[in-house]
């Protein structure tokens, strides 16, 4: 218990509940009033955005020249195969980049476990389904695996619009984050006669590449590194220009009608409560394909229109929707 206004309670880890190999709930208490929300929100944001991981960034499939192709003897089309490859959770132990191969010609299910990983790569979800082969079908592919942070659509990774691409390789949007879900809860805590303290409960789920407890430790170290400069704050020798936080891009506040989609596509979006472009870009391809009456043709139309404006599906926006935004 602190004895003066300049002393603060230091929380301790009181419980680590390992719910599964990929999920854990960590409880810390006691904290000064308000610190639970302050630290919980900071840790959550760092966990979701700043923990490095690995993802498939390019794919080469034998017999395929573009993503809208189909393969004989394979139930899924190439677009579906690419979507399934995005769900493969993997890591490299000693490299930041590698190429993995998968070759299968027997009838049945093709899973992530069919990759030839060698000695350096590990796959956390080997049962993840990539495709289904019928009699006589075969699937031979190569994937490029890279290390990164957060979500990076293809246009963001290209150095220039006319960047040279390796012949036969299809670039895909990459989600590098190994964190699947993060939530936090703040409850009341008590120390002696004080009942106005906080207890912070962090609930973290990963894709299996990193343990939840290690992810929390890494996030805390990132925060400490960023905040340490404030602890040793000194007068700067020269003025440093401080850039204001960017405002919401005006294009995201425009209604989806401004995209001039076909009537069918526009009606499907509104039926899913997607009224603004900012609503649309946060949806993934899988989510849109689950919408009634929205098929592959409509999805491709939406992706092409967004790409023409430098946007893509699956983007993440902070503080959306902005205050005062109304349904149209």
UniProtKB/Swiss-Prot annotation:
<keyword id="KW-0804">Transcription</keyword>
<dbReference type="InterPro" id="IPR036643">
    <property type="entry name" value="RNApol_insert_sf"/>
</dbReference>
<feature type="region of interest" description="Alpha C-terminal domain (alpha-CTD)">
    <location>
        <begin position="248"/>
        <end position="328"/>
    </location>
</feature>
<comment type="function">
    <text>DNA-dependent RNA polymerase catalyzes the transcription of DNA into RNA using the four ribonucleoside triphosphates as substrates.</text>
</comment>
<keyword id="KW-0808">Transferase</keyword>
<comment type="similarity">
    <text>Belongs to the RNA polymerase alpha chain family.</text>
</comment>
<dbReference type="GO" id="GO:0046983">
    <property type="term" value="F:protein dimerization activity"/>
</dbReference>
<comment type="subunit">
    <text>Homodimer. The RNAP catalytic core consists of 2 alpha, 1 beta, 1 beta' and 1 omega subunit. When a sigma factor is associated with the core the holoenzyme is formed, which can initiate transcription.</text>
</comment>
<dbReference type="GO" id="GO:0000428">
    <property type="term" value="C:DNA-directed RNA polymerase complex"/>
</dbReference>
<dbReference type="Pfam" id="PF01193">
    <property type="entry name" value="RNA_pol_L"/>
</dbReference>
<keyword id="KW-0240">DNA-directed RNA polymerase</keyword>
<protein>
    <recommendedName>
        <fullName>DNA-directed RNA polymerase subunit alpha</fullName>
        <ecNumber>2.7.7.6</ecNumber>
    </recommendedName>
</protein>
<dbReference type="Pfam" id="PF03118">
    <property type="entry name" value="RNA_pol_A_CTD"/>
</dbReference>
<dbReference type="GO" id="GO:0005737">
    <property type="term" value="C:cytoplasm"/>
</dbReference>
<dbReference type="GO" id="GO:0006351">
    <property type="term" value="P:DNA-templated transcription"/>
</dbReference>
<dbReference type="InterPro" id="IPR011262">
    <property type="entry name" value="DNA-dir_RNA_pol_insert"/>
</dbReference>
<feature type="region of interest" description="Alpha N-terminal domain (alpha-NTD)">
    <location>
        <begin position="1"/>
        <end position="234"/>
    </location>
</feature>
<dbReference type="InterPro" id="IPR011263">
    <property type="entry name" value="DNA-dir_RNA_pol_RpoA/D/Rpb3"/>
</dbReference>
<dbReference type="InterPro" id="IPR036603">
    <property type="entry name" value="RBP11-like"/>
</dbReference>
<dbReference type="InterPro" id="IPR011773">
    <property type="entry name" value="DNA-dir_RpoA"/>
</dbReference>
<dbReference type="GO" id="GO:0003677">
    <property type="term" value="F:DNA binding"/>
</dbReference>
<dbReference type="Pfam" id="PF01000">
    <property type="entry name" value="RNA_pol_A_bac"/>
</dbReference>
<keyword id="KW-0548">Nucleotidyltransferase</keyword>
<dbReference type="GO" id="GO:0003899">
    <property type="term" value="F:DNA-directed RNA polymerase activity"/>
</dbReference>
<dbReference type="InterPro" id="IPR011260">
    <property type="entry name" value="RNAP_asu_C"/>
</dbReference>
